[in-house]
């Protein structure tokens, strides 16, 4: 680790030890596991994240691009507060979902309709199912080394390198986690 990485005696290290007693590996997402311990965030503003030890980082990840407008943007905060006052997470349809779909379809020429999902993983699962139905083919391709959520058939070859790529006409599929189905590598 670099000299700026929080030390083993840091607050991040303490939180990691504490978290391991109630959360596997001490964090709620496997994508943030870093050895010897993850960096725990205290707060963020704009493009900058500050950890629990007071170290400041430029956030180039932006929660895997879901925070493209930056953290704690005043306009976003205002819109969220306004919606909170009206209620959230209805299990019924709302006009706002139609308004957002119309806005997106108007701005993206190739988009005729849109389906909203609860997570990127759920969106990938739906996209794979739709692709299989449309093409009537069982196999899919995926960007090598890229993260596409935690769905079994997308959570593969995340840590690949030239030593395990396989042949150009027969690439290797490397399961990312234990419990991946055997069909993943068939």
Model regions: which residues?
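Electropositive phosphate-/nucleotide-binding environments in soluble metabolic enzymes
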Residues: 9, 13, 43, 70, ...
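Glycine-rich loop-to-alpha-helix module at the N-terminal edge of alpha/beta enzyme cores
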Residues: 56-137, 141
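Active-site and channel-lining beta-strand-loop segments
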Residues: 38-61
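Glycine-rich, flexible loop/turn motifs
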Residues: 23, 29-30, 37, 63-65, ...
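Short beta-strand-to-turn element immediately C-terminal to the catalytic PLP-Schiff-base lysine
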Residues: 50, 69-70, 156-157
